[in-house]
Every structure is written in C-alpha cells, then in structure tokens.
Amino acid sequence: MRPARIIAAAGLALALAFCGTGAWTYARARGDDGLAYGRQRDAALTDGRRAIAVLNTLDASSPERARAGIRAWRAASTGPLRDELGRTEPRTGASARGTVTEAAVTALDPRAGTAKLIAAVRVEVTPAGSKTPTTDRKRLEAVLARTAAGTWKVQALNAVPLARTATEEDAR
C-alpha cells in the first residue's frame, strides 16, 4: 500500500470515529432529563421576566394607551390575576416603565406546569404633565403557570419586603 492511501484510510477512519462519537453524544443528551429540566427552567425564566416587566409598565398618557396597557397586562397573566386585571378601568395619569434587573427561578414543577420566580424590578414613574421620572426599586415574587401553548404566564404577583440595612436603621 502506498503511504498516501494509508494516510487517507487513517483520516477516513478518524472522521468516522469522530462522527460516531458526536452522534452517540447527541443521542444521550437528547434524552437527558436534566437537560429537559434546564430548558423548561430557562423558558420559565425568560417568559417570567418578560411578563413581570409588562405588569410593571403602563403608558397612561391617554385613555387609548392605558387601555392597550391593560390588554398587555391581561396577555401576560392568567387565572385570578388576569380576571382582576380585566376589571381595571383605564384612566389617564402617571405612566410607569418596569425593567427587570435580576431574576431567578426558585421552584419549578414541570409536571404540574408551575414555577416560582423572584425578580428585582426598576420602575420609572412619570407623573402626568411631568417630564422627569422618579425611580423605584421593587422585589417581586411571581407564581407562573404554563399555558396549553407552552408559554409561561404570571398567575400571582406579590411584593417581597425589603430588609432594612444598618445605614437605614441609623438614619431613623
């Protein structure tokens, strides 16, 4: 055999071994329960962050925009929270823009389709007739429910009390 054929055969064998190892690794990862759990956790976190930002945002500069904001709230929520938000009357007034700065899934039950999420939210509130917003920081806990479409929506939203720091206690 010529050296060129030996090198080509060795290269082909090496390529086949590499492809076989890749296929075997892919097949194992595809059926990995931990990987599936991680994907669901990531989906809950992504959808939950988006929904919490929506639920802390409202442009109330006009009745039409307030109505659109309330529709967005309803689209981001489910269950009793959605029903409660549906009873909200659109009014003009202060506008708010919520931004989720940090969030984490604290509990996930893929079989039941429920999750809990904690989030730190920065809310910029602009009073009606003012150009200067004030900033407020909130910590929230959300209970999420997976819908039939596979998306996660907020079922309950509660404020988490902030602990006072030593500096704040000294200021009192």
Predicted feature descriptions by range:
Residues 1-58:
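Juxtamembrane and targeting peptides
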Residues 13-15, 107-109, 144-148:
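Short, low-complexity Ser/Thr-rich regulatory SLiMs
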Residues 19-28, 87-98:
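Short, charged, low-hydrophobicity "junction" segments
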Residues 37-95:
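Core segments of small alpha/beta cavity-forming domains
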Residues 89, 119-123, 158:
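A mature extracytoplasmic/lumenal domain signature
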Residues 94-130:
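Surface-exposed, charged secondary-structure patches
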Residues 125-143:
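Periplasmic/lumenal scaffold domains of single-pass inner-membrane subunits
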Residues 137-172:
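Short beta-strand edge/turn micro-motifs at domain boundaries
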